[in-house]
């Protein structure tokens, strides 16, 4: 069984179910789950990528969020022992994504494609052997919650809902106090 999700319509592929939608939207994930009817997948491959802005830090942050979202989706539709592959950009927060993946798969590796330009930060995360349940390091959190916690721990602002948090100036995503 092959299920494809894309924002844009593509030519039909014999034997495949193609869903036109945003893989980060609940309605699209619901369509996938309804099609699966409780069946689980062996492999999830994602080449999700942001619409590039030309600002590396912004593109990398959006790529991290997209890859983490797809990791959470994959964990929900993969059978134990399954494999997840995603493309992301190397940079701030990537270790949080790798750690979240390691809590859900027994083998996690990063690869930079040899066909990619030397200056490219494109990397693939290959996650093999999905565990029946997440390791204790996940502490019941989603991958997105783990990555958000990782970003907070390294001083990156991920949300501004905490009225107690004193943030004087925001530059990109890193919070700076007036003293810096």
Regions found by a protein language model. Give the residues of each.
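SAM/dcSAM-binding transferase cores
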Residues: 118-180
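Acidic-enriched, low-complexity/disordered segments with a strong bias for Aspartate over Glutamate
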Residues: 6, 22, 26, 47, ...
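S-adenosyl-L-methionine
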Residues: 3-53
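Short C-terminal domain-edge/linker segments immediately following a structured domain
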Residues: 32-39, 47-51, 74-79, 115-119, ...
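Glutamate identity and glutamate-enriched acidic tracts
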Residues: 14, 25, 33-37, 65, ...
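C-terminal substrate-binding/active-site "lid" region of AdoMet-derived donor-dependent transferases
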Residues: 11-19, 44, 56-136
């Amino acid at each position: 069984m092959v299920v494809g999700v894309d924002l844009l319509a593509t030519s039909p592929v014999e034997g495949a179910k193609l869903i036109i939608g945003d893989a980060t939207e609940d309605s699209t994930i619901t369509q996938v789950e309804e099609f699966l009817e409780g069946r689980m997948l062996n492999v999830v491959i994602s080449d999700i990528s942001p619409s590039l802005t030309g600002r590396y830090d912004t593109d990398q942050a959006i790529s991290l969020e997209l890859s983490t979202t797809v990791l959470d989706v994959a964990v929900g539709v993969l059978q134990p022992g399954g494999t997840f592959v995603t493309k992301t950009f190397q940079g701030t927060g990537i270790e949080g994504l790798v750690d979240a993946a390691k809590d859900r798969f027994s083998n996690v590796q990063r690869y930079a494609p040899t066909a990619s330009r030397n200056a490219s930060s494109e990397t693939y995360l290959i996650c093999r052997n999905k565990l029946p349940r997440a390791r204790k390091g996940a502490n019941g959190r989603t991958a997105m919650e783990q990555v958000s916690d990782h970003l907070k721990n390294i001083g990156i602002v991920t949300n501004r809902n905490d009225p107690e948090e004193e943030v004087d100036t925001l530059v990109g995503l890193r919070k700076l106090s007036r003293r810096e």
